[in-house]
A protein has these predicted regions:
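N-terminal Lys/Arg-rich, disordered targeting/topogenic segments
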Residues: 1-14, 20
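Hydrophobic membrane-insertion alpha-helices, especially the h-region
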Residues: 15-31
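Hydrophobic single-pass membrane-insertion segments
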Residues: 30-39
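Catalytic-core regions of hydrolytic enzymes
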Residues: 39-52, 58-166
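Active-site-adjacent substrate-binding region
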Residues: 162-189
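Active-site-adjacent mobile loop/cap segments within catalytic or ligand-binding domains
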Residues: 183-246
């Protein structure tokens, strides 16, 4: 009888301990989500279940622009893109990448640099137009060799496409508010860019900053600055879909 009562009492203690442990875990999760303003509730965001293509500009052997300290555009493009991907997937979006590592996506039959670039861009367009995606965001960096004074991001949208303009406006606005409200640039229409011209969905290029500006180049190499850019772009995407569906 004594052993039975001891075992029963011990079992009750174990159950209570488990309940307390689960309760404490829930409290910690709630506290973490409260403290971390970049945590996302999947069922509360407009882009949930949307298909979004993220295009990381360039890719080896095409480095894109080169900035101070031999900073490679293609490398930073990819880092920002992967951070946006993480935020979107946490929010329930389906994310497709045109490239997921440092390499371009040219055909193996392409031999010269020129052939690889042409093959790469055509393959990107094919991914976009066969994906049934809702939007395309192409991530790039700017460079102006004649002057180092220019800095800041700017969005560019597909000409004669109202949805592209709305998307570019939402992203530009949220970047300005969440990264640097001194940036007063507005979205610009763009033409003669093959990827944007040939895409059959709302398409935007985000030039995330100038590698020709030393201070901005240093910032663009920093993980936390890339996180801020990704967060601003993420919020812009949410803003676009919220207005589209309202």
């Amino acid at each position: 009888m004594g052993d039975y009562m001891f075992k029963k009492s011990h079992l009750k203690y174990v159950k209570i301990s488990i309940i307390i442990f689960i309760f404490l875990c829930l409290i910690l999760v709630i506290y973490y989500n409260y403290k971390n303003n970049k945590s996302v509730k999947t069922n509360a965001v407009p882009a949930s279940n949307k298909i979004i293509i993220l295009d990381s500009g360039h890719g080896l052997p095409d480095n894109g622009a080169t900035g101070f300290y031999m900073t490679s555009e293609q490398e930073i493009n990819l880092k920002i893109t992967l951070k946006i991907q993480k935020l979107l997937e946490q929010s329930g979006s389906v994310v497709l990448l045109t490239r997921s590592d440092e390499n371009g996506i040219y055909d193996i039959s392409a031999d010269t640099i020129r052939e690889k670039k042409i093959s790469d861009i055509k393959n990107r367009v094919n991914i976009i137009n066969t994906s049934k995606a809702d939007i395309l965001i192409s991530i790039h960096l700017n460079k102006y060799a004649a002057s180092s004074v220019y800095s800041g991001w700017q969005t560019f949208y597909k000409e004669n496409n109202d949805e592209s303009k709305k998307l570019a406006t939402a992203i530009q606005s949220n970047l300005n508010k969440n990264v640097d409200n001194n940036n007063d640039r507005i979205p610009m229409k763009i033409k003669d860019v093959y990827l944007i011209e040939k895409s059959n969905i709302p398409s935007v290029i985000v030039e995330c900053g100038f590698l020709s500006n030393k201070e901005e180049c240093e910032n663009l190499k920093k993980d936390d600055y890339q996180e801020n850019l990704a967060w601003g772009i993420f919020l812009g995407i949410q803003d676009y879909f919220e207005k589209k569906e309202s």
